[in-house]
């Protein structure tokens, strides 16, 4: 295991993320995912990964890579773990890997929180200040630091509005949900004609 006194995550640490390579709701890929919108049948989806995925740390990855048989991979495929990278197809020493995943495909409701301060001169032009509020973990850095800043900006605008201040353009303050799951909480597709 590498020391934690460097730039990289420790070997037992796990980087989480979505395996979906697209943006937005996969069931409404080119249009806004709003209530009552048409959605594709999940059986029609072609861009979702077809293989199981389980994030692991690089300490565990090294154990698996050390045990893989097969020919050595091309040099451009090699990573930074100190091991011989093989194509696999078999495992050395008769090892076997069992992967169990407990993922399911389902729809969940997510809600964006959006506030507007109407512009005094150009109300049809927008300045958007936003942050997502969902997180893979507890979110102390991502997204809570950005959410704290967004809330402070909103509070400051509220104080300015009490003193009869108005912005030139409309200000949109947006708190997104479901950003971590392929930017699904974004409302960009619904507002493309305005933006």
Predicted regions located by residue number:
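Generic detector of intrinsically disordered, low-complexity, polar/charged segments
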Residues: 8-10, 14, 19-21, 136, ...
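Mature extracellular/periplasmic domains of secretome proteins
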Residues: 1-19, 120, 188-195
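Extended active-site and interfacial segments that coordinate phosphate-rich ligands
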Residues: 1, 129-131, 147
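Soluble metallo-hydrolase cores and metallopeptidase-like ectodomains found primarily
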Residues: 20-141, 155, 159, 163
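Acidic/histidine-rich catalytic neighborhood of metal-dependent amide-processing enzymes
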Residues: 135-195
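A general marker of short, structured functional hotspots
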Residues: 3-4, 16, 34, 81, ...
